[in-house]
Regions:
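Short, internal active-site loops enriched in acidic
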Residues: 42-43, 123, 156-157
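Short, glycine-/small-residue-rich phosphate/pyrophosphate-handling segment
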Residues: 92-93, 106-149
């Protein structure tokens, strides 16, 4: 299986990237082909809502999403979203990637991809992952992704760890 790991932490050595490294190592040991993409450091601009793509065409923005990431998404069997939780939600960089799914929503929904979520948070209260989980499940449902599971790591306690 081809797996695309979307990493979105600004901290290259933080807990979310440690989770990503462990996932990649395990997947490769099982014979899967894994590609990692650093969403945080890529030039990915937000959707401008111009609707020129019509949910099926190329995006008018010629950034790393349109020229690199979109092709990787199309080629993969599974997307793995890796992120620290920021204020009880998804980081802007990863949310921007999902917003840009709009440019090929129809095509992407018929690809029936698999998805997983690996996330960490400073906080370890009962509510820290509520919004994150709800959004992930909604995206899986809407995009017809098969939910392969989540790893939710709370209580990381320092910015260096997330």
């Amino acid at each position: 299986m081809k797996i695309l790991v979307l990493e979105s932490s600004g901290n290259k050595h933080g807990s979310s990237n440690l989770l990503a490294e462990a996932f990649v190592r395990g997947a490769e040991e099982k014979g899967h082909e894994v590609t990692e993409f650093d969403v945080f450091r890529a030039d990915i601009r937000p959707c401008i809502g111009c609707n020129r793509c019509g949910m099926n065409g190329p995006c008018v923005q010629k950034d790393d999403y349109e020229t690199k990431l979109k092709g990787l998404i199309k080629e993969t069997d599974m997307l793995v979203f890796v992120m620290p939780v920021y204020y009880y939600n998804w980081p802007a960089q990863l949310k921007t990637v999902i917003d840009r799914f709009y440019s090929f929503t129809t095509e992407l929904t018929y690809m029936h991809k698999k998805a997983a979520l690996l996330t960490v948070a400073w906080d370890d209260t009962d509510i820290v992952f509520t919004v994150v989980e709800a959004y992930y499940h909604r995206i899986c449902e809407y995009m017809q992704f098969e939910d392969m599971g989540m790893v939710l790591g709370g209580g990381c306690c320092t910015p260096e760890m997330t």
